């Protein structure tokens, strides 16, 4: 796993990085000593055998007379990690889904948890589509009445702490996710090329051309302009057009984010982020298993960003760059506090559990497919434009039986899952309210009385 410049140097660990993950490091070499004489070896072997018999007899005696249980020691090289504090799972979560940061995958994890535990998820009113009328500031008025009061919220919105606190339970845990600004901006430029006016103006849809003179294309007052400038700051409720030379603005925004969110995840270290999330919420490892969603096809991705272009992206999105640098550093401080060896061991356990789940659902690692090749329309991801292709997954053909709901939801895209939850929760809301009361009969209308006056002539 590569690390950006903000990652601290690695600590000594029984794990070492390899292509595709972490593997156990080899044990240290044993020092060589001269062989013992044969007679000494025989005496040593007898003593060892006698000692083993005594230990075995003592253990059996304890088991028979005291009902003791065997306690197996941890495997050699495994980190000694403290057990989490006992307590119930947290059942109220507000996730600020930022743009192009692996937020769709986090959202899917939260949707599945809420559905399994019969918890209400706040969903947008139909005029807002599957987002809470973004890019407007969030308002509780945008929440569908059949999804109130909610325990979870995880769809796109522009953060407003006061409105969310008014909507969500008092014990809600607030989390969000950030991504390295260069990779994020390249993804934004490709994904929203036909939506953001600043991107549409660029000749040949060239990111390098845009960055040569971004002010020539960018108009702050236009709809969807925020995709072209400091999008993370905008999503978090900040002023994405604030002068980065103001030395007081970014530290103030950082303090607000730290006060609002119990955890800021980092997309580049997604599995480590899920370990911290699981611990924060006191969830099980199975609660945070996932398959990557809303990915671009290889031909829709850039071939990497040249160093000069990367510097231009950071300069143009200076507020986002400063925000990410701060929370990347605090993220690794949390990892170190939790014990890096322990976190990496849990990452390995998470990946092994995920592999078992996808093996059960797909018979192996699922292969991303273009939407046109996915048979089940409920699994076809939304396509933002003809210029970019978003891939999804299809379940393997079965025996005609309905697909396993657990596997279906694991790869269900955001739009379809949101609509499914809205239908399900609307039905539940109507059942709770009961049938509508019968209509009250209106006043009885008498026929008009015949007039005794002569007709006008």
Annotate the PLM regions:
Residues 2, 31-457:
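Membrane-interface amphipathic segments in extracytoplasmic regions
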Residues 5-6, 21:
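Small-residue-biased low-complexity repeat regions
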Residues 6-8, 28:
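Intrinsic disorder/low-complexity segments
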Residues 20, 27-30:
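Plant-biased recognition of short, low-complexity, intrinsically disordered N-terminal tails
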């Amino acid at each position: 796993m590569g690390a950006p410049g903000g990652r601290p140097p690695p600590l000594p660990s029984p794990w070492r990085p390899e292509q595709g993950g972490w593997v156990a490091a080899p044990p240290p070499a044993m020092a060589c000593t001269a062989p013992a004489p044969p007679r000494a070896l025989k005496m040593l072997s007898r003593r060892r055998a006698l000692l083993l018999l005594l230990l075995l007899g003592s253990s059996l005696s304890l088991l028979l007379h005291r009902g003791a249980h065997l306690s197996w020691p941890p495997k050699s090289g495994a980190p000694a990690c403290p057990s989490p504090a006992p307590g119930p799972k947290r059942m109220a979560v507000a996730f600020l889904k930022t743009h192009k940061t692996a937020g769709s995958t986090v959202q899917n994890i939260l949707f599945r948890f809420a559905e399994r535990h019969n918890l209400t998820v706040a969903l947008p009113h139909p005029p807002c589509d599957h987002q809470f009328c973004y890019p407007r500031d969030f308002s509780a008025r945008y929440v569908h009445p059949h999804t109130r009061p909610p325990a979870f919220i995880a769809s796109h919105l522009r953060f407003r702490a006061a409105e969310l606190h008014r909507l969500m339970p008092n014990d809600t845990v607030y989390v969000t996710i950030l991504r390295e600004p260069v990779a994020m901006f390249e993804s934004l430029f490709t994904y929203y090329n036909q939506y953001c006016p600043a991107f549409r103006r660029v000749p040949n849809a060239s990111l390098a051309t845009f960055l040569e003179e971004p002010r020539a294309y960018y108009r702050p007052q236009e709809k969807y302009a925020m995709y072209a400038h400091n999008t993370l700051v905008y999503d978090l409720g900040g002023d994405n057009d604030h002068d980065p030379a103001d030395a007081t603005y970014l530290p103030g925004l950082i303090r607000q984010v730290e006060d609002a969110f119990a955890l800021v995840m980092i997309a580049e270290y997604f599995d480590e982020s899920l370990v911290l999330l699981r611990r924060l919420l006191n969830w099980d490892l199975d609660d945070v298993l996932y398959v990557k969603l809303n990915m671009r096809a290889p031909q829709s991705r850039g071939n990497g960003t040249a160093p000069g272009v990367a510097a231009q992206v950071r300069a143009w999105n200076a507020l986002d760059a400063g925000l990410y640098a701060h929370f990347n550093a605090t993220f690794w401080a949390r990892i170190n506090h939790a014990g890096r060896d322990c976190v990496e061991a849990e990452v390995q356990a998470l990946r092994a559990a995920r592999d078992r789940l996808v093996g059960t659902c797909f018979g192996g690692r699922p292969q991303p497919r273009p939407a046109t090749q996915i048979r089940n329309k409920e699994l076809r991801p939304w396509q933002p434009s003809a210029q970019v292709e978003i891939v999804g997954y299809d379940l393997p053909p079965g025996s005609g039986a309905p697909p396993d709901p657990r596997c279906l939801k694991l790869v269900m895209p955001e739009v379809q899952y949101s609509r499914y939850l809205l239908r399900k929760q609307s039905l539940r809301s109507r059942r709770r309210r009961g049938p509508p009361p019968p209509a009250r009969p209106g006043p009885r209308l008498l026929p008009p009385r015949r007039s005794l006056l002569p007709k006008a002539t």
